[in-house]
């Protein structure tokens, strides 16, 4: 159970970082 929770936590963190980087690149390109 702990491994599943940590796995989803890691996946959520990776998704958040990827989204932040993607939005950052989009803003830079728009400017």
Curated annotation (Swiss-Prot):
Annotated GO biological process: photosynthesis
Alphabetic keyword roster: Chloroplast, Electron transport, Membrane, Photosynthesis, Plastid, Thylakoid, Transmembrane, Transmembrane helix, Transport
Membrane topology term: Single-pass membrane protein
One GO cellular component term noted in the UniProt record for this chain: chloroplast thylakoid membrane
Location of this chain's protein in the cell: Plastid, Chloroplast thylakoid membrane
Keyword Ligase included in the entry's annotation: no
Subunit annotation: The 4 large subunits of the cytochrome b6-f complex are cytochrome b6, subunit IV (17 kDa polypeptide, PetD), cytochrome f and the Rieske protein, while the 4 small subunits are PetG, PetL, PetM and PetN. The complex functions as a dimer.
Function of the molecule: Component of the cytochrome b6-f complex, which mediates electron transfer between photosystem II (PSII) and photosystem I (PSI), cyclic electron flow around PSI, and state transitions. PetL is important for photoautotrophic growth as well as for electron transfer efficiency and stability of the cytochrome b6-f complex.
Homology family: Belongs to the PetL family.
UniProt-listed PANTHER family: CYTOCHROME B6-F COMPLEX SUBUNIT 6
The protein's name in its UniProt record: Cytochrome b6-f complex subunit 6
């Amino acid at each position: 159970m702990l491994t599943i929770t940590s796995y989803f936590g890691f996946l959520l963190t990776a998704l958040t970082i990827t989204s932040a980087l993607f939005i950052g690149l989009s803003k830079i390109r728009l400017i």
